[in-house]
C-alpha cells in the first residue's frame, strides 16, 4: 500500500514539471504577476514564444526581443487585453490576433504596410501604436476599429493622410512623416478628435474645409512644414481657420500674413470710406470741442495784385481737442492743403484719434506796397488711443507739421471785428463799381 502511494506521488511530481501551463507555472524566461495573468517577457533575446503561457493571460509584453514573425501564434489567447510587441524585427502585424485586444503597441519595427486584414475584426481595440516603422501606406476599412481612440502613426514614411479613420478617435499623431496632402473628406468624420499632430512633415497648404468638422479639437501642431506663404490663394483657408478656431495652435505658419489678416479683420474700414488714405477732410467729429479760445477767426482770401487793402492786424490762439473716428490706415492730409509735411508714424490702429491743435498763432500782418508771403507753422499732434479689447497693441504717435501761406505785412492796428470787416468790404466794392462806371 505504501509502495503504491509513493509511486503515485512520484508520478504527480513528474507531472508538475511536464505540464506547467495547466498548473499555472510561469515560463522561466518571463516574470508573471496577478496570478500569472500578467506576463512580462521583455528584453530576453527571444525569437519564439516561450512555452508554458496560460491561455487566460490578459497582459503580454514581448518588447525588446528578436521576433520576426508572430503569425497565428497568439490566436488562442482569447482573454488578451494588452499586447506589446514593440522594438522587435517584425515586418508586419501578426495575423489573426485575438479580438479581445484593447491596447497594442508595435512601435519601432520594420513594418512597411498596415493592411486592411491587419486590423479587421478588431472592434474592441482602443489604442494602436505603429510609430517608428517604415510605413508607406495605411489601408483602413470603414466600420472596423470602431472603438479606437488613439492612433499613433508618427515617424514613418507616409505621404498622404490615411482615409477611413474611425470616428471615435480622440488623438491622431501623424508627425515626422513625409505628408504632403490631405484628400477631401479625410477628416470629415473625426468630430470627436481633440489632438492632431501634423508637425515635421512636408505640407505646403491645407485644402478648403479640411478642418471644418473638428469641433472638439483642443490642440494641433503645424510647425516645421513647407507652407507656401507667398501664395495667398493656397494658405488663405488655413490662416482664416486658425483665427476662428478655439484650439491651441502650436507652430503658427506664416505669422506675418496672419498678423496682417488679424489687423484687417479687427479694424475694418468704416462704411463710406472708399479711399485707402485716412484724410482730415473726410472725417467727422464724434466728440465736442473741449475748449476753444479765439480772439477772431481769420479767413484767408485771395486778393488780386493790382489792389491794396488797408493795414490790418489780427491774431488767433487755438486750443482745441477733437476726437475722430479711426481706421487702420495712415493719417495723412490732403496734398492741396499743405506744402510740406512730416509723418513720424504710419500706423493708426486705435479705435479713436485725439487731435490737438497747439500754438496756431498768426500775428504781425499788414500789407505794404510790395506784397510778401511767409509760412506760418501749425502743429497738428495726433496721439492714437488704445481700444479696450486690444491691450497688446503698443500706443503710437503721429506728428504733422503743416505750413500754410499767409499774406503778411507789418503789424500796426488791431484786428477789426467781423462786422467792421463786412463794412470795409462793402465800401470797397461800392468804390470799385463807381470807378468802373466812370471808366465806361
UniProtKB/Swiss-Prot annotation:
One of its GO terms (biological process) is cell adhesion. It comes from the Eukaryota. Residues 1-24 form the signal peptide. O-glycosylated in its Ser/Thr-rich repeat domain. Residues 418-440 form a propeptide. Oligodendrocytes and myelin of the central nervous system. Residues 25-55 form the LRRNT domain. The keyword Signal applies. It is a lipid-anchor; GPI-anchor. LRR repeats lie at residues 56-77, 79-100, 101-121, 124-145, 147-168, 169-189, 192-213, 216-239. InterPro entries: Leu-rich_rpt, Leu-rich_rpt_typical-subtyp, LRR-bact_E3_ubiq_ligases, LRR_dom_sf, LRRNT. Ser/Thr-rich repeats lie at residues 229-270, 271-292, 293-335, 336-377, 378-416. Transmembrane segments: none annotated. Cell adhesion molecule contributing to the interactive process required for myelination in the central nervous system. Binds to RTN4R. This is Oligodendrocyte-myelin glycoprotein. It comes from Homo sapiens. The gene is OMG.
Amino acid at each position: 500500500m505504501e509502495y503504491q502511494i509513493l509511486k503515485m506521488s512520484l508520478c504527480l511530481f513528474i507531472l508538475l514539471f511536464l505540464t506547467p501551463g495547466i498548473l499555472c507555472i510561469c515560463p522561466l524566461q518571463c516574470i508573471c504577476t496577478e496570478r500569472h495573468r500578467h506576463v512580462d517577457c521583455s528584453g530576453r533575446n527571444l525569437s519564439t514564444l516561450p512555452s508554458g503561457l496560460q491561455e487566460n493571460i490578459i497582459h503580454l509584453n514581448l518588447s525588446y526581443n528578436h521576433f520576426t514573425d508572430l503569425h497565428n501564434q497568439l490566436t488562442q489567447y482569447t482573454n488578451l487585453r494588452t499586447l506589446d510587441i514593440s522594438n522587435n524585427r517584425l515586418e508586419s502585424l501578426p495575423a489573426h490576433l485575438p479580438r479581445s485586444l484593447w491596447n497594442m503597441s508595435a512601435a519601432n519595427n520594420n513594418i512597411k504596410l498596415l493592411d486592411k486584414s491587419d486590423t479587421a475584426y478588431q472592434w474592441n481595440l482602443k489604442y494602436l501604436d505603429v510609430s517608428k516603422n517604415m510605413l508607406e501606406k495605411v489601408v483602413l476599412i470603414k466600420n472596423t476599429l470602431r472603438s479606437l481612440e488613439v492612433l499613433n502613426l508618427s515617424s514613418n514614411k507616409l505621404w498622404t493622410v490615411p482615409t477611413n479613420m474611425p470616428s471615435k478617435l480622440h488623438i491622431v499623431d501623424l508627425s515626422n512623416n513625409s505628408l504632403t496632402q490631405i484628400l477631401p473628406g479625410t477628416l470629415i468624420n473625426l468630430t470627436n478628435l481633440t489632438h492632431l499632430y501634423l508637425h515635421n512633415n512636408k505640407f505646403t497648404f491645407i485644402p478648403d474645409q479640411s478642418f471644418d468638422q473638428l469641433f472638439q479639437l483642443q490642440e494641433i501642431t503645424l510647425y516645421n512644414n513647407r507652407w507656401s506663404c507667398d501664395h495667398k490663394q493656397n494658405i488663405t483657408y488655413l490662416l482664416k481657420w486658425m483665427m476662428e478656431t478655439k484650439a491651441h495652435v502650436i507652430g503658427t505658419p506664416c505669422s506675418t500674413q496672419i498678423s496682417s489678416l488679424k489687423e484687417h479683420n479687427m479694424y475694418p474700414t468704416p462704411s463710406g470710406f472708399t479711399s485707402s488714405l485716412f484724410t482730415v477732410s473726410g472725417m467727422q467729429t464724434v466728440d465736442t470741442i473741449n475748449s476753444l479760445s479765439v480772439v477772431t477767426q481769420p479767413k484767408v482770401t485771395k486778393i488780386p495784385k493790382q489792389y491794396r487793402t488797408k493795414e490790418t492786424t489780427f491774431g488767433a490762439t487755438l486750443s482745441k481737442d477733437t476726437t475722430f473716428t479711426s481706421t487702420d490706415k495712415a493719417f495723412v492730409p490732403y496734398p492741396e492743403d499743405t506744402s510740406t509735411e512730416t509723418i513720424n508714424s504710419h500706423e493708426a490702429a486705435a479705435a479713436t484719434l485725439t487731435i490737438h491743435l497747439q500754438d496756431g498763432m498768426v500775428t504781425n500782418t499788414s500789407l505794404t506796397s510790395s506784397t510778401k508771403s511767409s509760412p506760418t507753422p501749425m502743429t497738428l499732434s495726433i496721439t492714437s488711443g488704445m481700444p479696450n479689447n486690444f491691450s497688446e497693441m503698443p500706443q503710437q504717435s503721429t506728428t504733422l507739421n503743416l505750413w500754410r501761406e499767409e499774406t503778411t505785412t507789418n503789424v500796426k492796428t488791431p484786428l477789426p471785428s467781423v462786422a467792421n470787416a463786412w463794412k470795409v468790404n462793402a465800401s470797397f466794392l461800392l468804390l470799385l463799381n463807381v470807378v468802373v462806371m466812370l471808366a465806361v
